[in-house]
Amino acid sequence: MIQDTIADMLTRIRNANAMRIYTVCMPMTSVAREIAVILETEGWIDSWKEASVNSLILRLKYRGAKQQPILTGLRRVSRSGCRVYVSAKEVPKVLGGMGTAIISTSKGIMTDREARNHRLGGEVICLIW
């Protein structure tokens, strides 16, 4: 059984990205589905779909003839052993705004830009660049 489903999701994406694999299958949770929606709307992945009740399939994006990955880095920030919370003023900017931070707020899971616009802080789930 997987203890940290978000870390497992990010690791599967990171490994598939390194091997230039287009589709990634993973166990589906409500948080994983919301992260997949954010990744798609921000342009980090091509698409996602629910394959069955318990699985989620992501289609990764690559660019150019050499199939360079769009995602160059994923990092889990808040872990089960060490939670990281930030106030609305301390919401991180990833690479000066070129990347995305995913924040779990009282209004749901959102990007760093949305959290700043709504003036919300919360738990920093991961950083994507």
From Swiss-Prot:
Subcellular localization: Plastid, Chloroplast
Domain of life: Eukaryota
Disulfide-linked positions: none
One Gene Ontology biological process: translation
GO molecular function: rRNA binding; structural constituent of ribosome
GO cellular component assignments: chloroplast; ribonucleoprotein complex; ribosome
Main location class: plastid
Keywords carried by this UniProt record: Chloroplast, Plastid, Ribonucleoprotein, Ribosomal protein, RNA-binding, rRNA-binding
Pfam families on file: Ribosomal_S8
Purpose of the protein: One of the primary rRNA binding proteins, it binds directly to 16S rRNA central domain where it helps coordinate assembly of the platform of the 30S subunit.
Family per similarity comment: Belongs to the universal ribosomal protein uS8 family.
Subunit structure of this chain's protein: Part of the 30S ribosomal subunit.
NCBIfam families: PRK00136.1
Protein name (database record): Small ribosomal subunit protein uS8c
Origin species: Nephroselmis olivacea (Green alga)
Gene transcribed to yield this protein: rps8
